Amino acid sequence: MNPTLALAINRYPLLIPRIYNYLRLAIMPLEEIAAVVPTTSTILDVGCGYGLLDIYLAETSPNRTVIGSELNSKRVRIAQKISQDLENVKFFEENLLHPDRVQNIDCILLIDLLHHVSYEQQSELLATIYSLLPNGGTLIIKDLDNRPAFKYYWNLIHDKLVTGFDRLYFSSALKQRKNIEFLGFKITDYSQINHPFYAHYLMVARKM
């Protein structure tokens, strides 16, 4: 773990958020995600959780402005409290995907979010993002593929346990890529990130 990321985790004074973030890092390829995020953008992270990625993005580039959007009030309060000394990251307990709220946003992150919303809502969400981003704006998606089967079922069981057996809506990376391109995005980077148990894919798309 690099020193900046370790310092970001150590900002969390409470044991549960800190353990949660360490467990997330064992699964989520945070540094690979951060590597494809523009260093001079105004970034909106939809469903930011405790805000670890956003704090890391803010600390690794002072030219980024990072905005975290999260509906879990407890997580937002913790993220706000531990990031008070950082001028380039803010957290809000609301859905910011609205024209009045996302002015000057030129990069939007969807990190392990899509499979938690229905297929219809996924389509609506992606269409909304396309309409809100300026030409040349960037959408970054990190989610989980439904192949190979053993990784899919492993993650399905994991997410069911974590969410209290909420319904989940996984799509193949190929299908999600086609959905993005159908809206008018151009895929500029795509990778499948190696993990023994999780079928991560990372997609960078630009509005043309």
Enumerate the predicted regions with their spans.
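Conserved glycine-rich SAM-binding loop
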Residues: 49
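A conserved beta-strand element that flanks and buttresses the S-adenosyl-L-methionine
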Residues: 109
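C-terminal alpha-helical "lid/dimerization" subdomain adjacent to the S-adenosyl-L-methionine
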Residues: 142-183, 189-194
